[in-house]
Amino acid sequence: MKRLEVSNQAKLPTQFGEFCIQCFREKGSSGSKDHLVVFTPNFSQNPLVRLHSECLTGDALGSQKCDCGGALQMALERISKEGGLVIYLRQEGRGIGLFNKVNAYALQDKGYDTIQANEMIGFKDDERDYSIAGEILEYYRIKKMRLLTNNPKKIAALEKYAEVTRESLIVCANEHNQGYLEVKKLKMGHLL
């Protein structure tokens, strides 16, 4: 835990149920970044885990261009019933940040897919780093989990820290995100 500062725990009542929250401040050469863990008080030794990267447009604004907000809501609903945690990483736009994400959205409006748009503004298809999530899992002493994901990169990253069983999390396609979901499946290998 050399690069993490950990906050106190607090209660968080939500529309999905009662949770606790705890913040993890990641310290790095370019400053600090705060990540949030939302969890049920007494989760099992094989909890449901959702590793979720921040998506302001989907999570807070209800964007239909992606499946992020729906995936987060589905995860919170399941976790409130079955026990577990959401590790909410501050990695907006698959790690490119909000400013660059909006620029990528503008390119998508012109017909480019999500990967092409990222590459056109100088980024890889996915710039995220999940190692901080591994440190968070170690903090909670999680050695085995049921990971709510369709992303094989998340599975591979977390298998370094714990035994992972994948549970799918399918958000229905709509007219705005159908192409995005197809790109995630065909070009990024998502298990949709």
Curated annotation (Swiss-Prot):
Its EC number is 3.5.4.25. It comes from the Bacteria. This is GTP cyclohydrolase-2. Pfam families: GTP_cyclohydro2. GO terms for biological process: riboflavin biosynthetic process. Zn(2+) binds at residues 55, 66, 68. Catalyzes the conversion of GTP to 2,5-diamino-6-ribosylamino-4(3H)-pyrimidinone 5'-phosphate (DARP), formate and pyrophosphate. Disulfide bonds: none annotated. Its cofactor is Zn(2+). Keywords: GTP-binding, Hydrolase, Metal-binding, Nucleotide-binding, Riboflavin biosynthesis, Zinc. Pathway: Cofactor biosynthesis; riboflavin biosynthesis; 5-amino-6-(D-ribitylamino)uracil from GTP: step 1/4. GO terms for molecular function: GTP binding; GTP cyclohydrolase II activity; zinc ion binding. Binds 1 zinc ion per subunit. SUPFAM superfamilies: RibA-like. It comes from Helicobacter pylori (strain HPAG1). Belongs to the GTP cyclohydrolase II family.
